[in-house]
């Protein structure tokens, strides 16, 4: 499915008026309320169209593990000229100032069935049916031929539908909400990763199934569960943290922000920042969020995976990496292919080039470990689409960590990172 957004993601009527071919309305639908919303919307859009036959509807919960197989069976006998139109219902928060209150009723971006009914009764403007750019089954079947590791047409069509509607969602929610999809499957099906496992199998004399199971474990450990709600909570946390010692307004150069926006829209972008304070990353997160720039996946040591705060960071894109893994070839292979995945799909990445806080308030020599992994990914990336490394400098009037720096310079013991800092 072409993931380019249609001119108007609400005007399904206009799309159907322009086509007289067979149409298949493929809806991502989790609840009865969503099914009712979509059906009412479809009935309104179908009146007076030039469609010769009433479009076929397929309603699936696309997050269900059986959805792809079910879809494949329903697509099997349909002709190539069938136009597949992906649909879904988008739920919007009541507003930034109420988000934390909304959380008491569940995730405002993905509410449960009961909350959906309340929204439809009291705030129907928070419910927005959308559709994404359609494609014919013939086009999808031809594209599937170039994807030998995808199981079947149902799996391929479902993936393309999810990615297409996610792109349209960002036009409504904001570009700050850019979430990966199908990461585990894409890593495990990657030809180079499969070659890595075959090589490791020969070296370790391990059973293939055992290596795949080990890889799945590391994927779950590394890959964050990014959600819009997680990002909203992280930004609230970020503002709380940095406003304890600084003004809420962060001074930035608007021209540089627009330059970064253009780069992030067209290319993979790596943000390398200095790291003099615990506040650094929180200030960067807030600045990107306020300017509707995609939130970066951030690399951090697994020792920073604190209770509560670590969970919020993980749900917003933090990647916690083990401190030592040179003797773990499966972990290394998973990490490399995950970085490949993020770069090839233009997800911004962020980390400190110094590897950690400087401990003195001054810049220290860089550490090149992650940069090495990045360059490996860049070698496999499309050479016609350059990868950009963007240096970020966070400058403070006074660094709040200075007392800890002075104590350490006088011979004091460095305190481990923990929640007490906050």
Task: Identify what each model region corresponds to.
Residues 1-422:
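Membrane-interfacial terminal anchoring regions of lipid-handling membrane enzymes
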